[in-house]
């Protein structure tokens, strides 16, 4: 009698302990591993740095899909595309966005160039060389590569005439390259998207509220708001759903623009686009997030839940999206029919 072993879906990350935004990847890996086991997969967590040995050992087990949570190696975000490139060379399916999309979104200024060329509204910006904005324009100084609000606090909102000085100070303090974009005073929304059997599904957009913020405190999602659980910002920036009912026109605009970003960057698997909305109700795309945080209590997971997608269903859908990128004939020949089996698991997961 032949006993079929479970399909192997390892989880790969390169996070290091020490920073809350790094610990986020470790928490995601733990939650996803537990969920994959409950869905019937074999899974473990593979931590990597610049040594390829763990990846080589993982490949010996012939993974069905690699669940990619790598957003950098040894805290160097420039190495985020390393694992996708390695897996693409070996023709191994992996979750989330592909190598080329990750590279395109790694630099915020490069992302803004792409969005501007595609006709997607994004705030004007200043780099470290030129300053085309009037000096009294409010701008937000932020990292070109960090996607966790690293280096952003209340003092990041300044006049354009002060931007170059603040950019140089931030670069000296945090390293890397900083720039400044026009600060859109108004509301903030996150729009999450996940691949489905017939294409991308744009999930309900939550608004980030700035509850009880004093007039002199910039209404921004800074580092404290994301990671410092005891801070005023963290405790006073809840998310609120329902924009599709309270302002259907704005809800449609946000979803349409998010889908345009998905197509422009060639996003796959799952992604998130952050928006500011000005006083006239115009959305501005400010950040493109490939493979955003998907811990069980993360904003992305809460958004999926609002759309009726449970956490196990979300994880299964991300796995299935990776499989769909592989030629069906090749999958059938090598693996049988994991796509159909996955559809059954998704149905079962709804009751879990």
Enumerate the predicted regions with their spans.
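ATP-dependent carboxylate activation and anion-phosphoryl transfer catalytic cores
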Residues: 244-352
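Active-site nucleotide/adenylate-binding loops and adjacent lid/helix of ATP-dependent enzymes
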Residues: 1-14, 58-63, 102-188, 196-198
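Phosphate-binding site of ATP-dependent enzymes
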Residues: 160-256, 284
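Conserved N-proximal alpha/beta basic substrate-recognition cap immediately N-terminal to
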Residues: 17, 21-22, 26-124
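A short glycine-rich, hydrophobically flanked beta-strand micro-motif that places a catalytic Asp/Glu
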Residues: 48, 178-182, 189-190, 266-280
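Conserved beta-strand edge residues that scaffold enzyme active sites
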Residues: 50, 72, 101, 128-129, ...
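Short glycine-rich anion-binding loops that position phosphate/pyrophosphate groups of nucleotides
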Residues: 15-17, 71-73, 144-146, 291
